[in-house]
């Protein structure tokens, strides 16, 4: 799964940092029961945000036993901002690392290796050339493994853009789009920039793909609620089965 948190400020027209907004974001992850999720727009130690560790706060609010992997990509108000990954400890995490990516802002790639697959989480830059270069780096990282690799994140790029975008012509040399592309931004219903991609690394039969979706409504305790006020992005999930 991939989900841009919008720094858990809420998408109500008056963004504000609050515990309630963090809990609202976390309950989406809890309700979907994501095994592993790439999250973008996280902060840690920022003076104007009570020095919170947002990824840890999200993990705690889900009540799920997640391992937390944060990638400090750029300085922000005495702390750091960047992407991160929550991964259930039950998946059997073998290793984690971060890889620096180019950009006008600091950018990072989170790498989580489990027994059965590798998961890459990121938030690519707005600069076209930086995204192209990042795509090459990501392909190289994927090629370093002998097991299936998933790439999830806010790619700030779309396969539907002119020329196929900046990153996708490079990424699709290794990866295939496996997530739903029905529109991932509440404010731009036809725009898709949040993706989950797959590189089989020569093992095309290692994974069964069961279901995918962009979640725009969710049932919380019997009540269906719109998710367009939780964040300025919708969560995107991919349900798989390892063979």
Q: Where are the predicted features?
A:
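Structured beta-strand-rich core segments of catalytic domains in phosphoester-bond hydrolases
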Residues: 42-117, 210-216
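Active-site neighborhood of phospho(di)ester-bond hydrolases with catalytic His/Asp-centered motifs
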Residues: 37-40, 69-72, 150-154, 178-181
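N-terminal, active-site-proximal structural segment of metallo-dependent hydrolase catalytic domains
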Residues: 1-61, 75-77, 232, 239-243
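Active-site-proximal beta-strand elements of phosphoester/diester hydrolases
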Residues: 1-12, 95-97, 111-125
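Catalytic metal-binding/acid-base residues of hydrolase active sites
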Residues: 4-6, 42-43, 123-125, 155-158, ...
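Extracytoplasmic/secreted proteins, especially bacterial periplasmic and envelope-associated proteins
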Residues: 20, 24-27, 31, 53, ...
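Loop/turn elements at helix/coil->beta-strand transitions in domains of secreted/extracellular proteins
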Residues: 32-36, 63-67, 115-118, 145-149
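Metal-dependent phosphoester-hydrolase catalytic domains
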Residues: 96-98, 128, 140-150, 157-243
């Amino acid at each position: 799964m991939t989900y841009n948190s919008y720094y858990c400020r809420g998408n109500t027209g008056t963004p504000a940092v609050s515990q309630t907004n963090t809990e609202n974001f976390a309950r989406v992850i809890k309700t979907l029961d994501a095994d592993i999720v790439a999250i973008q727009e996280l902060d840690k130690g920022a003076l104007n945000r009570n020095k919170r560790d947002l990824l840890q706060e999200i993990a705690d609010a889900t009540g799920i036993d997640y391992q937390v992997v944060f990638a400090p990509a750029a300085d922000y108000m005495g702390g750091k901002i960047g992407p991160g990954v929550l991964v259930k400890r039950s998946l059997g995490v073998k290793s984690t690392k971060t890889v620096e990516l180019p950009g006008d802002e600091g950018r990072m790639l989170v790498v989580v290796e489990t027994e059965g697959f590798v998961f890459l989480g990121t938030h690519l830059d707005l600069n076209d050339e930086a995204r192209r270069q990042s795509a090459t780096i990501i392909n190289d990282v994927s090629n370093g493994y002998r097991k299936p690799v998933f790439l999830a994140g806010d790619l700030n790029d779309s396969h539907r853009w002119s020329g196929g975008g900046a990153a996708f012509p490079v990424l699709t040399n290794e990866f295939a789009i496996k997530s739903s592309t029905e529109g991932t931004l509440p404010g731009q219903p036809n725009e898709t920039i949040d993706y989950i991609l797959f590189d089989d690394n020569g093992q095309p039969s290692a994974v069964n793909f069961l279901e995918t979706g962009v979640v725009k409504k969710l049932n919380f305790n019997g009540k269906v609620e719109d998710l367009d006020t939780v964040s300025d992005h919708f969560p995107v999930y991919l349900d798989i089965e390892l063979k």
